[in-house]
């Protein structure tokens, strides 16, 4: 199997990791009997996250993922969150209706080294925090939650700083969860240059949510989508009392 094929297989897991991550942002812990993951997944949303059946393990080899495996991944992230106790980048609530994602993938025959990813993240203004992943925060208002976040595509998606020198990943995922602490278009305009700069620093390539090279046409399409999203979610105009 070619290196690019392995990267594409690896990125498939990111969609599930993103959904699991969103459920964990600001999510109160529940007993296993109280979980309603299947019911939540059936609720209509503007964006349908990909349903996947395979991914890659820490060695870059394919592994099968079942519904039970997805729940286990969620539990692993939950445990890490409790152990770390870092709420930097935690969403104030779990409500969301759209996710916009991009990827930075290593070039053929290469990998992204954990240590290099951390250095690049710090250079681009990302902060390590909630769920042991990186976040871009609103300057001066971290309590508003992340503008966007960055995770590894390898399960469980987090960065183990104690073993960061040994970490390798074929790609990293950036995800913008809406509503964000600013307009969707403004949030995108902060995420896109960060992703592009990360790709430069890591000598990687930027991929869209379909795992294709991100081009101008796709960027323009995403901007149009987010403008429409902002129009739909803007506050209704205040009615003015008539002048007499």
Swiss-Prot record:
Q: Where is the composition biased (Basic and acidic residues)?
A: 35-50
Identify the GO cellular component terms for this protein: cell division site; plasma membrane
Q: Which loops or segments lie on the Cytoplasmic side of the membrane, by the record? A: 26-244
User: Which parts of the chain span the membrane according to its record?
Assistant: 5-25
Q: Which UniProt keywords apply?
A: Cell cycle, Cell division, Cell inner membrane, Cell membrane, Membrane, Transmembrane, Transmembrane helix
Write out the topological domains of type Periplasmic: 1-4
Q: Record's Gene3D superfamilies?
A: ZipA, C-terminal FtsZ-binding domain
Q: The organism sits in which domain of life? A: Bacteria
Task: Check the record and name the SMART domains matching this protein.
Answer: ZipA_C
According to its UniProt record, where is this protein located?
Cell inner membrane
The record gives the membrane topology as:
Single-pass type I membrane protein
Q: What's the chief localization of this chain?
A: membrane
What InterPro entries is this protein classified in? Cell_div_ZipA, ZipA_FtsZ-bd_C, ZipA_FtsZ-bd_C_sf
Name the GO terms of the biological process aspect: division septum assembly; FtsZ-dependent cytokinesis
Q: Which family does it belong to?
A: Belongs to the ZipA family.
Q: What does this protein do?
A: Essential cell division protein that stabilizes the FtsZ protofilaments by cross-linking them and that serves as a cytoplasmic membrane anchor for the Z ring. Also required for the recruitment to the septal ring of downstream cell division proteins.
Tell me the subunit arrangement. Interacts with FtsZ via their C-terminal domains.
| Protein name as catalogued | Cell division protein ZipA
Taxonomic source organism: Xanthomonas campestris pv. campestris (strain ATCC 33913 / DSM 3586 / NCPPB 528 / LMG 568 / P 25)
Q: Which gene encodes it?
A: zipA
């Amino acid at each position: 199997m070619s290196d690019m094929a392995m990267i594409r297989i690896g990125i498939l897991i990111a969609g599930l990791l993103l959904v699991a991550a969103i459920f964990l942002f600001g999510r109160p812990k529940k007993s296993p009997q109280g979980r309603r993951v299947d019911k939540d997944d059936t609720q209509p949303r503007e964006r349908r996250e990909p349903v996947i059946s395979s991914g890659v393990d820490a060695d870059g080899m394919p592994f099968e993922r079942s519904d039970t495996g997805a729940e286990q991944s969620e539990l692993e992230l939950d445990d890490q969150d409790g152990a770390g106790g870092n709420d930097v980048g935690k969403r104030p609530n779990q409500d969301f209706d759209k996710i916009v994602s991009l990827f930075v993938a290593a070039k053929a025959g290469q990998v992204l080294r954990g240590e290099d990813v951390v250095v690049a993240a710090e250079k681009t203004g990302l902060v390590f925090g909630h769920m042991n992943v990186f976040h871009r925060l609103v300057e001066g208002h971290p309590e508003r939650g992340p503008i966007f976040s960055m995770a590894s595509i390898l399960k469980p998606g987090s960065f183990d700083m104690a073993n960061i020198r040994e970490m390798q990943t074929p790609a990293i995922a950036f995800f913008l969860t809406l509503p964000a602490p600013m307009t969707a278009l403004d949030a995108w305009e902060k995420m896109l240059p960060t992703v592009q700069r990360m790709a430069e620093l890591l000598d990687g390539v930027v991929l869209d949510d379909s795992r294709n090279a991100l081009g101008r046409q796709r960027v323009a399409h995403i901007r149009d989508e987010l403008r429409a999203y902002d129009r739909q979610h803007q506050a209704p105009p205040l009615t003015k009392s008539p002048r007499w």
